[in-house]
């Protein structure tokens, strides 16, 4: 899968958080993921059992944060407007109430920040396979989790949760999949 410009709106607006995503699969298993953030001179690579970042020519191993508490977690999403379904909007808002802080606007870079230990959770909705496949080996090999909201493989895209660990992931899933999320707070 190739996504030549992930974060098209960022690219058009001159915001340097867009990137090129490339994944390689063998027998329906993603075996290589590469994210290039050219404006920042950063490249993220995951394959085999390793994940690393190359920044200005220097290679460093990627490791997710060790935080295991949802209330201390940082949450990222590209935009709350990508949650087109009202139930998903409410679910995201409920999750937002349970974390320390929320940041918007990261596109593919949010996932790279998670793999590099700067972010705890990334939640998105409506992703295509080319938006997410390259990120799987990077996040998993850095020690994180990348699944759909219903705990499935991300290969087909959809509603995605990336987390630093299973404990935070399960709490996120529980909140996002609650049958009747609070209806009193929409994101817009």
For the regions a protein language model found, what residue spans apply to each?
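DPxDG-like acidic metal-binding loop motif
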Residues: 1-52
